[in-house]
């Protein structure tokens, strides 16, 4: 049970104490090492009565978003460290560019159990098991209201693009859907055995 972050992690001052005190809350690991919070964490999980350790890693891309440390080098270094403790490693790559996320998936193939992309709010349909045994999807998508523009009020979003001026965007409320993936991981090898994309309820 944890929540990963991204480019809005530090948007609210309340995040300071939450990230410092709650190990369930992660922020991108490729921020500077002096930034408060955790970029990865190992959590106990129970599967069929057995207790296992699942590591969750959070990194953020640099294309169109931020000039952070290299997510490729950061994730690789963390994975090497975590392998000494567990081979069940789940990576959330928060990124804007699909090419960057796909390249990252190839780079981490065989090094981690899963690479799941986030950020764009739009689910992709390219879920797969890569040759090295890593489950991958470019973007898991958004859980929220689809009667809008990536979760925001559609009228305000249209006005912002139409007039090219700022408009306050409230959260959309209608047509709520769940976007998710379920990844099956072999607890012995750490390789993914399956990945299933979820989008419910679907569009009519």
Please tell me what each predicted stretch does:
Residues 1-204:
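Acidic, metal/ion-coordinating pockets
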């Amino acid at each position: 049970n944890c929540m990963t972050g991204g480019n809005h992690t530090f948007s609210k001052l309340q995040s300071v104490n939450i990230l410092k005190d709650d190990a369930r809350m992660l922020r991108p690991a490729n921020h500077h090492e002096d930034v408060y919070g955790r970029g990865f964490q190992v959590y106990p999980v129970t599967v069929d009565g057995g207790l296992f350790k699942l590591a969750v890693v959070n990194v953020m891309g640099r294309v169109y978003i931020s000039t952070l440390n290299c997510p490729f080098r950061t994730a690789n270094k963390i994975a090497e460290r975590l392998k000494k403790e567990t081979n069940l490693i789940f990576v959330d790559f928060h990124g804007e560019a699909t090419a960057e996320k796909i390249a990252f998936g190839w780079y981490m193939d065989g090094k981690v159990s899963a690479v799941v992309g986030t950020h764009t709010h739009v689910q992709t349909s390219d879920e797969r098991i890569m040759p090295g045994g890593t489950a991958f999807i470019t973007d898991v998508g958004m859980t929220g209201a689809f009667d809008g523009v990536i979760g925001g009020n559609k009228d305000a979003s249209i006005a912002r693009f139409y007039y090219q001026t700022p408009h306050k965007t409230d959260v959309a409320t209608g047509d709520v859907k769940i976007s998710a993936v379920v990844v099956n991981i072999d607890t012995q090898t750490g390789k993914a055995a399956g990945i299933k994309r979820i989008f419910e309820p679907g569009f009519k």
